[in-house]
Amino acid sequence: MSSLGFSVGTCSPPSEKRKCRFLVNNSLNKAEAINLRNKQKVSSDPELSFAQLSSCGRREAIIGFGFSIGLLDNVSALAETTSCEFSVSPSGLAFCDKVVGYGPEAVKGQLIKAHYVGKLENGKVFDSSYNRGKPLTFRIGVGEVIKGWDQGILGSDGIPPMLTGGKRTLRIPPELAYGDRGAGCKGGSCLIPPASVLLFDIEYIGKA
């Protein structure tokens, strides 16, 4: 299965057979990303480590969701629908707790693990950590993920923090996600179209 460097992604060097990693935060420039890498404790898993930014021909930074051309071959095109009543914060970020956690909440700057399924508003799945068989490991609250994730997990603007073991659905407006640029764009088509509202089912596993 061939891999694809998306408009806001990063890849491993061409000599290494690893999937492109989807960018979670598209606001960092290359210098900032390298500086963040030097300060950050990175997982020993090579797929979650910083890759050579130039290999995808992009200047944005790393650590994020895994995408490849054949991703949807192994994941349902439509998400499983579950009734969920959303509470909406002033920022437009909405949440619904399907399972309230039992353990400690995340602390800003902490390395945590979370499983997730990402969907468009029409229910089409564009990414799933469950499909890859392992959770995403990232540092929360420092810009490694889109703003909607940081706010939706840490708690902000009237949204309570997630607790370890909790399962929450986030409905994220474009301004807290990928904005008017969209993501995963190539040849006039985008996996995440511009100005998309995104739905994420997140399972907060806890501290990494």
Curated annotation (Swiss-Prot):
Expressed in stems, leaves and developing flower buds, but not in roots. Changing C96S: Reduced PPIase activity. GO terms for molecular function: peptidyl-prolyl cis-trans isomerase activity. Its main location: plastid. One of its GO terms (cellular component) is chloroplast thylakoid lumen. PPIase activity is optimal in oxidized form (S-S) and minimal in reduced form (SH). Reduction of the oxidized form is mediated by thioredoxin (TRX-M). It holds the Pfam family FKBP_C. Disulfide bonds join C84-C96, C185-C190. It catalyses: [protein]-peptidylproline (omega=180) = [protein]-peptidylproline (omega=0). Keywords: Chloroplast, Disulfide bond, Isomerase, Plastid, Rotamase, Thylakoid, Transit peptide. Residues 109-208 form the PPIase FKBP-type domain. Signal peptide: none annotated. It is found in: Plastid, Chloroplast thylakoid lumen. It is an enzyme of class 5 (isomerase). The keyword Thylakoid applies. The interaction between FKBP and the Rieske protein probably occurs before they are imported into the thylakoid. Interacts in vitro with LTO1. The precursor, but not the mature form of the protein, interacts with the Rieske protein. Belongs to the FKBP-type PPIase family. PPIases accelerate the folding of proteins. It catalyzes the cis-trans isomerization of proline imidic peptide bonds in oligopeptides. Responsive of the major PPIase activity in the chloroplast thylakoid lumen. Regulates the accumulation of Rieske protein, an essential component of the photosynthetic electron transport chain. This is Peptidyl-prolyl cis-trans isomerase FKBP13, chloroplastic. It comes from Arabidopsis thaliana. The gene is FKBP13.
